[in-house]
């Protein structure tokens, strides 16, 4: 079944400006700027006023309408990122060999360096994405905090770090060692 026209509305809060030119969305807010290229998705953006943007699909099927909702979610996440920011907390879990995590800089790029995972001599490196800041928690032992404006970059960095510390060829119910996401939230919490 084809839908003649389907619309989604994006509400823009005060202090945030959204500019769209040829399906490249640029969101500017108090925490910074985020840009996303949506040229591959066939949707129509209409700016009603500074506080409301309509996204529409004409003659779209079920998957095309689903892509419309995805576009709305992407822009909503960008708006949340430039107003509140995203913060992921990760904890190191180990039974015997203590995991050693450091931030190193090689050739101008930052890496998260994981040593002594399950007693391995191998050094695991995870590149830090642009716009993601990493700090070690001062009041909680074995915790690392990833924060930034883009939820995609912050969550992908957390996923990369979790994936590089997977236990292979052993029973994962017994060997629970690794670095896991313990908390997902915002940098500036609503009080």
Swiss-Prot record:
GO cellular component terms, alphabetically, are:
cytosol; cytosolic large ribosomal subunit
Top-level taxon of the source organism: Eukaryota
InterPro entries recorded? Ribosomal_uL6-like (IPR000702), Ribosomal_uL6-like_a/b-dom_sf (IPR036789), Ribosomal_uL6_a/b-dom (IPR020040), Ribosomal_uL6_CS2 (IPR002359)
Keywords on record:
Cytoplasm, Ribonucleoprotein, Ribosomal protein
Q: Where in the cell is it found?
A: Cytoplasm
- Tell me, how does this one assemble? Component of the large ribosomal subunit (LSU). Mature yeast ribosomes consist of a small (40S) and a large (60S) subunit. The 40S small subunit contains 1 molecule of ribosomal RNA (18S rRNA) and 33 different proteins (encoded by 57 genes). The large 60S subunit contains 3 rRNA molecules (25S, 5.8S and 5S rRNA) and 46 different proteins (encoded by 81 genes). uL6 lines the binding pocket for eukaryotic elongation factor 2 (eEF2).
Tell me the function of this protein.
Component of the ribosome, a large ribonucleoprotein complex responsible for the synthesis of proteins in the cell. The small ribosomal subunit (SSU) binds messenger RNAs (mRNAs) and translates the encoded message by selecting cognate aminoacyl-transfer RNA (tRNA) molecules. The large subunit (LSU) contains the ribosomal catalytic site termed the peptidyl transferase center (PTC), which catalyzes the formation of peptide bonds, thereby polymerizing the amino acids delivered by tRNAs into a polypeptide chain.
**More about this protein:** Present with 52400 molecules/cell in log phase SD medium.
**PANTHER family, A to Z:** 60S RIBOSOMAL PROTEIN L9 (PTHR11655:SF16), 60S/50S RIBOSOMAL PROTEIN L6/L9 (PTHR11655)
Q: What is this protein called?
A: Large ribosomal subunit protein uL6A
